[in-house]
Amino acid sequence: GTFDKGDKPLAGVMVTDGMNVVKTNKKGRFSLPGFEKTRFISMTTPARFETQQFYLPVKENRKSYDFLLTESERTQPREHSFVQITDTEVTGGMGRWVTDLQQYVKNEKPAFLIHTGDICYEPGLKMHNQVVNAETMNCPVYYCIGNHDLVKGNYGEELYESIYGPTWYSFDIGNIHYVVTPIDHGD
């Protein structure tokens, strides 16, 4: 990988192609053996850090996948809270719940917010990405695919992945390793 001035490599960061998992070396580098169905290279965001992008889409001629991590006090505490939401269907629009959620997050200051599925088909997937994200919530936001998020295509999760990235991933907060996995089937 390449580093900007002042950036330092980080050893021990877990990186995966969806099948294989490796750790970065002391120079912050990694090598994956290759998995032909890989759609993303993603990393486990380590405790003490935040990132704007924990995954990168695989591109045919791309040889390097670099992730930018910034230190964050929010993801360090051993004891922390998080906000979990689910089934926030958007029939008739977002309504007042988004404003209420923003206020709740502002008051409680959770380490992160996670949406555990049923973002609700194409309209919901697109709308949530615009209104429930790290910038609008002022904390890291993670998404997990639900059965109402699988839409027609070669893979039911194609639209979800084009907006939110891989359906399998993990991150660390304090001394807890969180693993996000998809449901096994849709409607």
Set out the residue ranges of the language-model regions.
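Extracellular/periplasmic catalytic domains that process cell-envelope and extracellular macromolecules
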Residues: 9, 34, 75-78, 106-107, ...
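Short, acidic Ser/Thr/Gly-rich low-complexity loop/linker segments typical of extracellular
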Residues: 9-11, 16-33
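N-terminal active-site segment of His-dependent metallophosphoesterases
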Residues: 35-127
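Structural motif
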Residues: 1-11
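Short, solvent-exposed loop/turn elements at domain surfaces
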Residues: 24, 91-95, 151, 187
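Extended active-site neighborhood of metal-dependent phosphoesterases/phosphodiesterases
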Residues: 44-57, 61, 126-187
